[in-house]
C-alpha cells in the first residue's frame, strides 16, 4: 500500500483571492485594445433543423459602420471541415453551410464599428430557411423513419464501440441474481461567470493569424484550427489571457469560434473582437451529453458482483465535435469504480440529434457512470434485502490489493476505500438516519438516504483517446503524442523546416 500524501485531505491556502477580489484580474474582455479592432455579432439559426436556401445581406451592408458580413457560403468556400475522431463522413464547419442542425447554430457573422451596430445590423440580415423535421431523442434518432441529419452518413449513428473485458457471458451464466434497469441522464449545462471571448488579428503581409481567447487547453486544438483555416501551424498564434473566469470544461469547446472569428478577421482585413452574451452561451455554447442507458448486473445472493453489462446511447447533438466521443470513453480506466468485479461488457453508441453540441462539462462523462453504477448497487441491495452500504462494502477493493489494475486498464495506486466509506457513514450518522427513516416511513412520510461511491480520473494521460478513436486514427500525429502532465512541451519540425512549438 502506498504512503499517505502530505497534501491530500489537508487545507491548502488559496493564493489568487486577493488579486481577483481587488479587481486586478485580467480576462479576455480586459485585453488592451487592439488597434482598429471591430466587433462581431453572430446570426444564429432559430430552427432545430432547416435547409439554408440563401442570404440577403444588402440591408445589413448598407448600414453605417458595418465593415462586412461572413455567411455560411463564405465559410464553405474558405474553410475545411474540422477533423472528427470517427470514420463517418460528418462535415462540421465553424458555421452552418448547407443546413442548420440545432437551434443557435451560427449561420453568419456581422462585423461593425462597435457591438451595438453589429447587433442591430445582424437583425437586418435575412436568412431564408426551409424547416425540416427534427429529432431530439437518441433512441428515436436510430429508428428507420427518423430524419437523417447528415445525408452523406446515411444514419444518425456517428459511432459505435463494443468493448469486452474478462468473461461477462460466463459471469451472467454463473449468477444467482440478475438485475436489468434503464436510466436516463439529462442534458445539462454550466454557467461560468465569464462567457466565451475571441479577438483575432490577421497580418496579411506575414500571413500570421493571432488569436487571443479564453480557451481552456488551446494546444490540443491548434492543429485542427490551422487545418480548417489553411493557416500553417507556425503562422497561427494562440494567446490565453492571464485569467479565465471559470470553465467547467466548457471553454475547451470554444475552438469553432476561434476559426469563425479568425476567418472574419481574414476576410475583412481588420482585427475582430467577439464576446459571447449570456443568451448565446445558454443556447449554443457547449453542454453535457444526455444519455439513455441500460445496465445489467450479475451477482451472487450474498451481494458479490460477478460482472456488469453497460449499454448506452450518447446524444452529441447536431454534429460530433472533438473531443467527443470522449463522453463515452473518458472514464474507461475506472469503469468499475471502486469495486473489484473483473467481467464487463460495454456497448456504446454515439448518436446525432437536433440538439446543441456537447463536450466536456462538469466531470465529463463521470456523472453518467456513477449515476448508473450506484443506481444498480441500490437496486441490488433492495433485491437481496441488504443494506445499500453493506452491498457496497462487500464489493470494495481492499487496501492490501493496492496498487490495483482494473480490468479496463486503470491503475489505482493508493487509497483505502472501506475506510473512506466508513468515515462517510460515521460523519453522516448513518445508523441514526436509517432508524429515523424507518420511523418516518411507518408514519407514511418520505425519507430518502442516498449513497454514492466514485473513483474519479484526474490526469488521465489521454489514454482514453485511443479507446474513443477508430483504429485508423489512433496513431495520427494530430492526436498523439499527448501528455497528461501538468506541464509538457512538444516540438515538431515539418519537411520544409518549419518549427511548431507547443
Task: Give the location of each predicted region.
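Flexible, low-hydrophobicity surface segments
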Residues: 1-159, 178, 257
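Glycine-rich loop/linker segments at domain edges
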Residues: 16-22, 85-86, 155-198, 290-375, ...
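Alpha-helical support elements that line or immediately flank enzyme active sites
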Residues: 42-72, 108-128, 198-268, 325-334, ...
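Amphipathic alpha-helical
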Residues: 67-80, 160, 411-441, 448, ...
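Short acidic, glycine/serine/threonine-rich loops at helix termini
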Residues: 79-84, 121-124, 191, 213, ...
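Glycine-rich and small/hydrophobic secondary-structure elements
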Residues: 88-112, 116-117, 248-301, 358-383, ...
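Non-catalytic terminal/interface segments that mediate subunit docking, oligomerization
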Residues: 197-203, 207-209, 215, 224, ...
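Beta-strand segments within the central parallel beta-sheet cores of soluble alpha/beta enzyme folds
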Residues: 235-242, 269-279, 306-311, 341, ...
Amino acid at each position: 500500500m502506498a504512503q499517505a500524501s502530505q497534501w491530500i485531505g489537508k487545507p491548502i491556502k488559496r493564493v489568487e483571492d486577493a488579486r481577483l477580489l481587488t479587481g486586478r484580474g485580467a480576462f479576455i474582455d480586459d485585453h488592451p485594445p487592439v488597434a482598429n479592432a471591430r466587433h462581431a455579432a453572430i446570426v444564429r439559426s432559430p430552427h432545430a433543423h432547416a435547409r439554408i436556401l440563401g442570404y440577403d445581406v444588402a440591408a445589413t451592408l448598407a448600414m453605417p459602420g458595418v465593415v462586412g458580413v461572413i455567411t455560411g457560403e463564405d465559410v464553405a468556400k474558405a474553410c475545411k471541415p474540422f477533423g472528427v475522431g470517427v470514420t463517418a463522413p460528418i462535415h462540421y464547419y465553424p458555421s452552418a453551410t448547407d443546413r442548420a442542425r440545432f437551434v443557435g447554430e451560427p449561420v453568419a457573422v456581422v462585423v461593425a464599428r462597435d457591438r451595438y451596430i453589429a447587433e442591430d445590423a445582424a437583425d437586418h440580415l435575412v436568412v431564408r430557411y426551409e424547416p425540416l423535421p427534427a429529432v431530439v431523442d437518441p433512441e428515436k434518432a436510430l429508428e428507420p423513419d427518423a430524419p437523417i441529419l447528415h445525408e452523406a452518413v446515411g444514419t444518425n449513428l456517428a459511432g459505435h464501440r463494443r468493448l469486452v473485458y474478462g468473461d461477462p457471458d460466463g459471469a451472467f451464466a454463473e449468477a444467482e441474481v440478475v438485475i436489468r434497469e434503464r436510466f436516463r441522464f439529462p442534458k445539462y449545462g454550466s454557467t461560468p461567470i465569464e462567457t466565451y471571448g475571441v479577438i483575432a488579428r490577421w497580418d496579411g503581409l506575414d500571413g500570421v493569424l493571432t488569436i487571443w481567447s479564453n480557451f481552456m487547453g488551446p494546444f490540443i486544438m491548434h492543429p485542427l484550427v490551422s487545418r480548417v483555416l489553411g493557416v500553417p501551424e507556425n503562422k497561427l498564434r494562440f494567446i490565453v489571457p492571464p485569467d479565465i473566469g471559470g470553465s467547467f470544461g466548457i471553454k475547451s469547446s470554444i475552438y469553432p469560434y476561434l476559426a469563425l472569428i479568425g476567418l472574419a478577421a481574414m476576410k475583412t482585413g481588420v482585427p475582430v473582437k467577439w464576446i459571447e452574451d449570456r443568451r448565446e452561451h445558454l443556447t449554443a455554447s457547449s453542454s453535457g451529453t444526455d444519455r439513455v442507458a441500460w445496465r445489467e448486473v450479475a451477482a451472487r445472493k450474498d451481494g458479490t458482483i460477478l460482472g456488469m453489462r453497460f449499454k448506452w446511447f450518447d446524444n452529441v447533438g447536431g454534429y460530433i465535435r472533438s473531443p467527443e466521443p470522449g463522453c463515452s470513453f473518458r472514464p474507461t480506466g475506472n469503469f468499475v469504480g471502486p469495486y473489484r468485479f473483473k467481467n464487463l461488457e460495454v456497448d456504446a453508441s454515439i448518436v446525432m440529434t437536433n440538439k446543441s453540441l456537447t463536450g466536456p462539462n462538469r466531470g465529463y462523462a463521470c456523472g453518467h457512470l456513477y449515476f448508473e453504477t450506484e443506481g444498480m448497487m441500490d437496486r441490488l441491495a433492495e433485491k437481496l434485502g441488504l443494506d445499500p452500504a453493506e452491498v457496497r462494502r462487500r464489493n470494495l477493493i481492499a487496501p492490501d490489493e493496492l496498487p490495483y489494475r482494473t480490468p479496463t486498464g486503470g491503475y489505482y495506486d493508493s487509497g483505502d476505500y472501506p475506510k473512506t466509506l466508513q468515515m462517510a457513514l460515521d460523519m453522516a450518522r448513518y445508523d441514526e438516519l436509517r432508524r429515523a427513516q424507518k420511523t418516518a416511513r411507518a408514519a407514511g412520510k418520505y425519507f430518502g438516504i442516498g449513497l454514492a461511491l466514485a473513483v474519479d480520473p484526474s490526469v488521465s494521460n489521454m489514454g482514453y483517446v485511443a479507446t474513443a478513436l477508430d483504429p485508423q486514427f489512433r496513431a495520427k500525429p494530430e492526436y498523439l503524442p499527448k501528455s497528461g502532465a501538468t506541464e509538457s512541451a512538444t516540438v515538431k519540425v515539418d519537411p520544409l523546416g518549419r518549427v511548431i512549438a507547443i
